[in-house]
Amino acid sequence: PDHFDREAAEEFSARHKNALVYIPSRREPAPETLSVGNFTVELHRVRHTQVAGYGKSTVDAMIVSCEGNCVYVASDTAPEAAIHEGILAGRKPDAAFWNGEMLLYKPERALLHVCAEKSFIYHIPIDPQDGLRRKLERIVSRYPEELENVRLLAAYPSVITL
């Protein structure tokens, strides 16, 4: 609810005729998997992080696999280690993408180190003076050993090599 843009999704679909576009419906269960070519996407409908004014909502966390690589996209899942541990079920993806809230709590920070080879934090405000951005930067610098595999994505788009 906080940043879905139906018009942008429809424009993307019109420009990329061969792309599979999945737009979740909160009234229908998520499919367990989507497959396109060599890509497989596992969908896990879970609790969305708290968003003021929206009450309780859900989001689809995803595990994307292709040609031996695996990426976990936590989306805006609530920052609870148990949710992510349940989705990953002992798997260790090559990379994981997390909301910045995961850095705010000790059990969730610990998860970033053990649940993926590389962890990337997104939704980082672009303004270097933004309070949330500065707080996340301080947390990463405060726990260098615990967060050695964590990188803040402060520029969009970013190039990531697995």
Question: Predicted segments — roles?
Answer:
Residues 1-25, 88-97, 104:
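Active-site metal-binding motif and surrounding structural segment of the metallo-beta-lactamase
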Residues 4-6, 81, 106, 129:
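Glycine/Thr-rich phosphate-binding loops of Rossmann-like dinucleotide-binding domains
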Residues 5, 41, 76, 96, ...:
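Divalent metal-coordination and catalytic microenvironments
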Residues 8-69, 144-161:
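Metallo-beta-lactamase
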Residues 25-27, 46-47, 100-103, 122-127:
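Short, acidic/turn-prone active-site loops that include or flank metal/cofactor-
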Residues 27-37, 56, 85-90, 109-162:
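Binuclear metal-ion centers of metallo-dependent hydrolases, dominated by the metallo-beta-lactamase
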Residues 48-114:
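Active-site-proximal loop/helix segments of hydrolase catalytic cores
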